[in-house]
């Protein structure tokens, strides 16, 4: 069943032995030469003597004081609030414009450390890997960033005597208009709070001058709102059939009367309101009444002029429909019936005009998401004593002319959130305020009443910005006292920076002597 194993009948011959094709050498000598004895012949290979002394310096050496050169990678640390620097150099400085010592030897006082230098071997071209970390506490409404002021054109004077609401025209006698600077308090607000403060500022301007010069409440010609005022507009009568505008916020809006305007030329408030220029680099940004063609706010239906006689209470006699001319307090809605096909108010809405094709508002402006950060741009870092000036700059230590070595977006962000039933929250808030008319001065007037908040709203938030800025050319001689400067788009130190740290890690980029 199994086969037995049999031994091989023949054994293969061994390989032929002969001289090796390669010479047998040990350290360049034949193997028969004793180690340490003089060779009978010259060695085939030259073996240099072993180096027993370490180098005293090199192209990557870093010298500091009288210590031995350091040839390992090191780091320089820049800190904005060192106690020794505060007492010595930064009494009148801030976190965006300060001087700091990069020599942290505890045996040296700040004055001595500032006179020391760190030498990078001048036979090499050095670069430093820069990493910055900045923390800010910037509000979205501030005078520094021009987000607390806007210019408005309002009626400042008119002839005494009211305007007949039944006249069907809007022509206040002897009306004079004037530009005002509307300023709101600095702070960090939500979008609906900014709109409330703007409207309250309009009322204050009216009480300050217009009221004393025969200007009526119905002549207040600038209103910031959030509603689509043409919702539920009847296509036949042109009237808003419920007799009231839909109280729901959608997007910030500007409502104007003839002769009134809003100027955003030197203000960032347009960005907070989501109203931007379609050509952002053009000069000036003014929204006038004439720009809002096609945006007339429809008049309200006077419910007392019609009689609902059907079961579902939806059918009315069109011939009997009349516009509502004034509110319960007698404040006119400035309804125009002369020269128009359908009754409409003299008020014009930017939001309605924007959605009218080929209107000046649509051609000049752009509806955007409200930027609660105020559209603040970039943040520039300058370290004139550490890095050589990049191409396009020249060496300068002046505050507004320092060469820029790093940049990043300002770490202030717009955060969008959804708040359901925001109008109910507003009503509850107004009910708990001691001054119930703080932001709702004219609750009976459908135009001038408080604007409803939006369910999709925004807030401003500051978050730390940690940025790896890359490798930049270093100077070969670094003084112990270094200047750090953080500026805005206009090259001004930013007062809202309250923590700044940076690290620089030097390394050799190339040789400055070998070509």
Swiss-Prot record:
Bias kind Pro residues: ranges: 9-22
HAMAP family: ADV_CAPSP
Primary localization class, coarse: virion
Source organism per UniProt: Fowl adenovirus A serotype 1 (strain CELO / Phelps) (FAdV-1)
Note, other: All late proteins expressed from the major late promoter are produced by alternative splicing and alternative polyadenylation of the same gene giving rise to non-overlapping ORFs. A leader sequence is present in the N-terminus of all these mRNAs and is recognized by the viral shutoff protein to provide expression although conventional translation via ribosome scanning from the cap has been shut off in the host cell.
Keyword Iron tagged: no
BP GO annotations: endocytosis involved in viral entry into host cell; virion attachment to host cell
Start and end residues of each stretch annotated as Disordered: 1-25
Assembly information from the UniProt record: Interacts with the fiber protein (via N-terminal tail region). Interacts with the capsid vertex protein; this interaction binds the penton base to neighboring peripentonal hexons.
Stored Pfam families: Adeno_Penton_B
Similarity comment: Belongs to the adenoviridae penton family.
Ranges in a coiled coil: none
Keywords of the record: Capsid protein, Host nucleus, Host-virus interaction, Late protein, T=25 icosahedral capsid protein, Viral attachment to host cell, Viral penetration into host cytoplasm, Virion, Virus endocytosis by host, Virus entry into host cell
One GO MF term attached to the UniProt entry: structural molecule activity
Functional note: Major capsid protein that self-associates to form penton base pentamers, each in the shape of a pentagon, situated at the 12 vertices of the pseudo T=25 capsid. Involved in virus secondary attachment to host cell after initial attachment by the fiber protein, and in endocytosis of virions. As the virus enters the host cell, penton proteins are shed concomitant with virion acidification in the endosome.
Induction (UniProt): Expressed in the late phase of the viral replicative cycle.
Gene name of this polypeptide: L2
Protein name (Swiss-Prot/TrEMBL): Penton protein
One annotated Gene Ontology cellular component of this protein: T=25 icosahedral viral capsid
Compartment(s) of residence: Virion; Host nucleus
